[in-house]
Regions:
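Conserved beta-strand positions in repeat-built beta-propeller and related beta-rich domains
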Residues: 1-4, 42, 50-54, 102-105, ...
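Beta-rich, blade/repeat-based domains predominating
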Residues: 30-47, 77-97, 130-145, 174
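Beta-propeller fold detector
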Residues: 21-28, 69-77, 122-130, 168-174
Length: 174
């Protein structure tokens, strides 16, 4: 569970009594002031991604079979040289695990990252303008469409996802 104000991702186990208990391997700590907000899990490789709301970063962690989790990388969600406010919002992967998207409210951008299928490493690929203050978005089950709403918008935007590249193209806004 991502705990924004504590800069920690809490881990739990579920007992036979249906009660949660702290995980014996402990919690995951993020950078001070990062503000972990949302988590996503890769469908195949055991990687866990954390969107940090307050510093606009994206962390990748790897979960080993024994339950140990190690930090692998931390990337900026915004374009190189971006100097404005940071306010990360949401994170989703395509169902095939090849692409990861984040939304950032202050810049009104969706960011695209490629996921290396061998190592799991993230590569920043592109940034796309979208609805003002994009608080939430979803990717359809086929992985061909991304639907986004803006906190400061009356519209919903539908972006098509190019299967080979993950690039977004605006299909409609209503």
């Amino acid at each position: 569970v991502a705990c924004l104000k504590e800069d920690v991702i809490r881990r739990f186990t579920l007992g036979d009594d249906d009660l949660l208990a702290p995980h014996p391997l402990g919690d995951i700590h993020t950078a001070p002031g990062a503000g972990p907000r949302h988590l996503a899990r890769h469908p195949d490789n055991g990687d866990i991604y954390c969107l940090n709301e307050l510093d606009g970063t994206l962390n990748r962690y790897h979960r080993e079979a024994d339950g140990h989790i190690s930090a692998r990388e931390s990337l900026d969600m915004l374009p190189e040289g971006y100097q404005g406010e940071r306010w990360g919002a949401d994170i989703h992967l395509t169902p095939d695990g090849r692409f990861l998207y984040t939304s950032e409210r202050a810049s009104s951008l969706l960011s695209l990252f490629g996921i290396d299928q061998e190592s799991g490493a993230l590569t920043p690929l592109a940034h796309f303008p979208t609805e003002p203050c994009p608080r939430g978005f979803a990717i359809d089950h086929s992985g061909h469409a991304l639907i986004v709403t803006g906190q400061d918008s009356q519209d919903v935007a539908l972006h098509r996802i190019a299967p080979a590249t993950g690039q977004l193209s605006l299909a409609s806004r209503q």
